[in-house]
A protein has these predicted regions:
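Short beta-strand->loop
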Residues: 91-99, 161-165, 230-248, 344
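Short, solvent-exposed loop/beta-turn-alpha elements that line the ligand-binding surface or hinge
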Residues: 39-44, 240-244, 315-321
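Short, glycine-/small- and polar/acidic-enriched structural segments
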Residues: 3-175, 375-383
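Second-shell loop/turn segments in exported
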Residues: 25, 130-136, 259, 279-280, ...
Length: 383
């Protein structure tokens, strides 16, 4: 079936319901799966808050093309850039950056290859989704990482042979994948995500010698692959001091539809209040947060997750540095034709929702602290 004939499915719009979706990466949203604090915030205002896939009617496509007005997404950077550029207008509410996960290049562990320059004339794999409905974020991440690592070693794409690996990438509305689930990590009850090669599609080609090297994420994925004893990294962008190299589908971005932002800003503020609260807790309890994130992410284990998040600020923000990181990702997509329409990242960013959420939390905390210490006023004296 051609992509133009694919039937997309979402629930009817109801502003008394807000859905969320997230990627299996480091974010306050993933930690909140166990805490439930954002759900509590929505309950205070009488709104249902649930995972996008908690109802069968929602297929997986809203995670990639945001075709659900009452959805808030917290996940990898490239899909929401594509959505805002070429599909529909959204708002960028905040980001969380993993500043030392730029990506690395791995080869077979027993190959006589130790430096990037030894890959001249050799084959590097590059995935290619055949699904034109959604963004090919795997490929963009690989392409950007490979290009950067070559450049850091005085090389260009002309020095190597790129080998494409097309795949159908068409499971997003497959009935077998649409059983409802309350939490994102329930997907991993069906699949061992840390060892499922569906999440590392080029690894088999590397192992069999079809290619000589592939891109992988620094730390997540990398440590899982190295633990097999079959692979080793010969270059790692995370070891460079240049923070602009850390662009592996990150920073993770929070986005909502322009319809939600304009017609129901209180819902956006409520979500951001939850993310701030959970992010603060995660910053103060990194080991506990690591144990939660280990169930969903691609670090090797809990301790590896802790080392990965130890220096990450889990409270979403829109700092000048992080907005430049977003811009770097967007500019790469424009330059290489992954999006058709350019846009201004600073116009996309909507810091007012984060600011309002922070103010409301401060006011609520102040009222609680002072209210608990004040006597009940006498009605007679008030009169």
């Amino acid at each position: 079936m051609s992509d133009s004939k694919v039937k997309l499915s979402t629930v009817p719009l109801n502003w008394n319901e807000i859905y969320y979706t997230n990627c299996p990466l480091v974010s306050a949203s993933n930690v909140d799966q166990e805490l439930g604090w954002t759900k509590e915030e929505f309950k205070k205002i009488g709104v249902k808050y649930a995972f996008m896939r908690s109802v069968r009617e929602n297929d997986w496509y809203p995670h990639y093309i945001h075709n659900l007005d009452n959805l808030i997404r917290f996940g990898g950077l490239f899909p929401p850039i594509h959505v805002h550029a070429d599909i529909r207008r959204t708002r960028l509410l905040g980001v969380t950056h993993a500043p030392r996960e730029g990506g690395c290049l791995i080869v077979r562990s027993r190959d006589d290859i130790y430096r990037m320059c030894e890959l001249k004339g050799k084959k590097i794999g590059l995935s290619k989704s055949l699904n034109t409905i959604k963004n090919d974020w795997w490929r963009i991440q690989e392409h950007q990482g490979i290009e950067l690592m070559l450049r850091m070693n005085g090389m260009t794409m002309d020095d190597i042979e790129l080998v494409e690996f097309p795949y159908a990438d068409a499971w997003y509305n497959d009935p077998k994948m649409l059983d409802p689930m309350e939490n994102p990590s329930e997907l991993w009850l069906k699949r061992d995500h840390k060892h499922d090669l569906a999440f590392r599609p080029l690894e088999t080609a590397l192992e069999k010698g079809v290619v000589d090297a592939i891109y992988t994420q620094s730390k997540p994925f990398q440590h899982l692959q190295e633990a097999t004893g079959k692979f080793k990294a010969i270059e790692d962008l995370s070891r460079y001091p240049d923070w602009t190299l850390q662009v592996a589908n990150i920073p993770a971005a929070i986005t909502c539809s322009d319809v939600m932002a304009e017609q129901h800003p209180e819902l956006v503020v409520t979500f951001m209040k939850g993310m701030i609260k959970v992010g603060r807790w995660a910053n103060e309890h990194k080991h506990a947060a690591a144990a939660i994130l280990d169930k969903q992410t691609f670090y090797l284990d809990v301790e590896d997750t802790y080392r990965g998040i130890e220096h990450i600020d889990m409270v979403p923000n829109l700092s000048p540095q992080n907005l430049v990181s977003v811009e770097i990702g967007k500019d790469f997509m424009v330059r290489h034709g992954y999006i058709k329409n350019d846009f201004n990242v600073h116009h996309w960013a909507a810091p007012e929702f984060l600011e309002m959420a922070a103010k409301e939390l401060i006011n609520e905390r102040w009222e609680k602290i002072t209210g608990d210490k004040l006597p009940q006023a006498s009605t007679a004296r008030l009169g």
